[in-house]
Curated annotation (Swiss-Prot):
Domain LCN-type CS-alpha/beta: 2-65
Function: This protein is not toxic.
Subcellular location: Secreted
Taxonomic placement: Eukaryota, Metazoa, Ecdysozoa, Arthropoda, Chelicerata
Tissues where the protein occurs: Expressed by the venom gland.
Family assignment from sequence similarity: Belongs to the long (4 C-C) scorpion toxin superfamily. Sodium channel inhibitor family. Beta subfamily.
Name the record gives this protein: Neurotoxin-like protein STR1
Amino acid sequence: ARDGYIVHDGTNCKYSCEFGSEYKYCGPLCEKKKAKTGYCYLFACWCIEVPDEVRVWGEDGFMCWS
């Protein structure tokens, strides 16, 4: 497991979020992806302890594509 920005399935696009909604939105979203938890960091959802089988941003480059 590792920490990172989760991406939308089939894309390399991060989940955007608003500052101030740190845990309300990203926490449950990260948990759905089987991570321990997560929060909003630099306007995207950063997840803690993401399982190795779940892709995170940067593994397939840094451009958003769909």
